[in-house]
From Swiss-Prot:
InterPro entries: Aminoacid_DH-like_N_sf, Malic_enzyme_CS, Malic_N_dom, Malic_N_dom_sf, Malic_NAD-bd, Malic_OxRdtase, NAD(P)-bd_dom_sf. The chloroplastic ME isoform decarboxylates malate shuttled from neighboring mesophyll cells. The CO(2) released is then refixed by ribulose-bisphosphate carboxylase. This pathway eliminates the photorespiratory loss of CO(2) that occurs in most plants. It is an enzyme of class 1 (oxidoreductase). It comes from Flaveria pringlei. PROSITE patterns: MALIC_ENZYMES. Its EC number is 1.1.1.40. Pfam families: malic, Malic_M. PANTHER family: MALIC ENZYME-RELATED, NADP-DEPENDENT MALIC ENZYME 4, CHLOROPLASTIC. Disulfide bonds: none annotated. This is NADP-dependent malic enzyme, chloroplastic.
Amino acid sequence: MMSLNSSSVVKSSISGVSWTQSQSVRLSVRRPMVVAMVNSNGRPERSVGVSVDGAVKDVNAPVAVEVADSESKKPTAVVGGGVEDVYGEDSATEDHFITPWSVSVASGYSLLRDPHHNKGLAFTEKERDAHYLRGLLPPVVVNHDLQVKKMMHNIRQYEVPLQRYQAMMDLQERNERLFYKLLIENIEELLPIVYTPTVGEACQKYGTIFKNPQGLYISLKDKGKVLEILKNWPQKKIQVIVVTDGERILGLGDLGCQGMGIPVGKLSLYTALGGIRPSACLPITIDVGTNNEKMLNDEFYIGLRQRRASGKEYAELMNEFMSAVKQNYGEKVLIQFEDFANHNAFDLLEKYRTTHLVFNDDIQGTASVVLAGLISALKLVGGSLADHKFLFLGAGEAGTGIAELIALEISKQTNAPLEETRKKIWLVDSKGLIVRSRLDSLQHFKKPWAHDHEPVNKFLDAVKAIKPTVLIGSSGAGQTFTKEVVEAMSSFNEKPIILALSNPTSQSECTAEQAYTWSEGRTIFASGSPFAPVEYNGKVYVSGQSNNAYIFPGFGLGLIISGAIRVHDEMLLAASEALAEQVTQEHFDNGLIYPPFTNIRKISAHIAAKVAAKAYELGLASRLPQPENLVAYAESCMYSPKYRNYR
């Protein structure tokens, strides 16, 4: 084997292979495969040996992040959202060189099919010669920005959102860095494509459009082998797992194994919006069957063809999964439960919140983003949270989670007992207003919201009886905020706050146009899915989107950069307050209670800083010492999709 340099010799006799390098190399042995080493002429040399996890770095390249404040402490965490930057991808600038040795690069043909390192037509002339790419690409060399421009042009040619979704997923499988650069720079246009509402349709048709597997699938057939399956995943330094069992996908119900589109979409946002490196993210679907007859009878369905398991069988598989994750990835891996049905969502969160770093976005993430919107809305309507009365349509994960966080915030502001602050919040479920006379028949998570009141069966009657100042929909039932409901809200509120949170768009309690029209332009409105601006009486109203994507990427980043070992409710309150602080007077003047997504990475950095600060304050952070400038530190830890130069 030819050496890179005659100085600073590093040798290995593993599998009969030896090499030399002029600079430090990180080494780890994997199974034998064909790799390419660089000879003295600068060209890769084909050889059969072991894969080398290493990068020839600039000797001056920083290993740890130093925040902007020159007076601040130097944190011990390496860059990239707290994940070791083995290849120098985040600490390197475009002028530094990296060597893509994590996979086989014995041929240029293979390199072009590796989404983690492929640059397409952006490979330079030198790289084409060095990595056997000459002739495998057209002669033109284009830059990253032109590639983004071309891809956006191509995507906009599709009129059907699902086709745009498929184009984005194809790009992710082909060129990871181009995918994330495209998404980051066009987030407002592409967010509804890679996530709600389009991802819902993608999950419904996942078996039909399925091409390449993404993430891990763990089924009942794998009981006793979960740890082995986790070890099959090629990336070993996982920091965030998003897991679903597919039972309650958005407002679409039980989609079984085809719910995988949700973890995949969520984790793409962890990277694009929160800066967590893609290699540190792992989407997982737990397949315990489905009760959806349409799926079971679909010849293209990709999951187990059996009725959904429950009880002991379900609990044992989930317990094995949680134990295996902790054993394989350690104490500080974040496990986000996603789209579990109510009965499992609450039980899993309660069971594992004291033993694992767990987060339920449907319960906690939704609550945090809604609370942020309410804090912002108070600047438009006046008063404090304690001055308002809240009525929810929907008493599931989202509804009760939001209600509890509102009650916690009021308790924090007023020093009143939580039992008292809950009395300002009323919930309606499928059987009507939740009152004390129904206590014996209520599910355990609804019981704290059973107040003294006569039974009310119809939602409109509940609105008229309670006379709330804030109306929140989390029912998953479309068109339930009727004209009569909105008019009733407008009759006893000068500026009624109406939040129609259910996803996707078809399940929204009302549209933006309906809310503004029926309230005669007086409502403060936000929704879970995006709506176009509305013109009413010569004025244009731009509604806000109460999207969990405001919260969970920054929240996760905050947990990682602090090395948090548990999630505490005060961290959720801190995230809400941080998001509300990002709404400016200009946004208020336009009727917005959430900031635009165009600046989402800076918003996420501020949220991460607040969450990390709270983790340090509560003694739940393990990454020491604490950086003095947490915002700058969070920004410096974020993954960049810029191309790296290859030797």
